[in-house]
Structure formats: structure tokens, C-alpha cells
């Protein structure tokens, strides 16, 4: 299987953490993509194989035989169903709905983080400080909501917890530790799960530039 990646993307990281938790890392060829800083607002010319794998030109993208998947949600669902027997996200029932509740909040954080980052990369005249603040505040509200769910996490590290941990890690790496004030119990939980091998192996780094 071929997975198109970049080390900065939290969407890529949640897939890679899932891959490591499922123990299937040796089944993948990881293809590093390169992006200019204008990726958020301008058309970026990419290699033909990448465009074929993902016409929407975003990462991650998975090519697995005759299956091509172009977002982290479908990739994780495919891998967990095919190789994990739905270990990361239950196929149905109350356990699934609770996990999806957590996952949706954590994904909302990721979306806000990426939109904030894209706006910050605009030139000064085009940048909206109000929009940047709006995305920051959205993320903090979601962290506060996840704080309320932290006691229910226990020792589990399924999809909801994985996405939450990735959201915590990206915010701290990109924007600093301010999120911890909104969610101290979540921060304590994060400090524990960040020691997992799957989290250590996927720590974020800047994307190679073109």
C-alpha cells in the first residue's frame, strides 16, 4: 500500500498513529510530499502520481491495489475494518456512537487548527486577524468540551482518543501550550499517551518546502 504523507499534517498523523496501533506499518510505502507555504490559498502543481491518487490534491491519500482513498476518515475506516476487525472504532452500538462524539470534537479542533494556519500564511494585507482569533477560540472551546470527556477515556486508545491526542500535539507544536489552560485534565492525559510508541514515532515536523 502507498500512503502520501507530510510530517506537519495532523490528518496524516492520525492515520499513521492508527497504522502503528494496528501493527501494519511494514505494509506501507510512505511517499513524502512537498508543499510551498502558499498551499492554503493558491493552486499548487503536484506530481502526476499524487494528483491521480487524490484529485482534490490533499493529504493523506492511500492507494491500496484498486482502492484509492483521499481523506483520513475513509482511510482509517478502511484500515481498521480490513486489518483491525474494528478495534479502533466499533462497527456499531453505543461504543461506536460515544467514540464518534469524541472524534467529531477532536476533528473540529484539527479543522480549526489548519484553517488558522492557512490564514497565518497569508501576506499581511490579506490576512484576517479576526478569522485567526475565531479559529483559535473554536479550538479552545472544543478542547474544553473534550476536557469533560477525559474521565471516560480510561486506558482506551481508540480512534476518538487518537484524534484527540493528535489535536493536542499539533496545537502545542504549532501554537504553544496555551490550550492546556482550557483543559488541564486533558493535558495530563495527553502527557501520558504521548509516550506511546505510535505517538513518539509520528511527532510533527515542518513540511519539506518546494
Q: What kind of region is each of these model predictions?
A:
Residues 91-94, 157-159, 204-207:
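Short, surface-exposed recognition loops or helix-turn segments adjacent to catalytic cores
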Residues 1-129:
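GST-like domain detector, emphasizing the conserved glutathione-binding G-site
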Residues 20, 173, 195:
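Short polybasic/polar patches that bind polyanions
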Residues 16, 73, 114, 175, ...:
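Short, flexible helix/strand-to-coil boundary loops that buttress conserved ligand/catalytic motifs
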Residues 181-210:
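Long hydrophobic alpha-helical segments typical of transmembrane helices together
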Residues 106-191:
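GST-like fold's C-terminal all-alpha helical module
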Residues 76, 80, 100-103, 143, ...:
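Non-transmembrane alpha-helical segments in soluble domains
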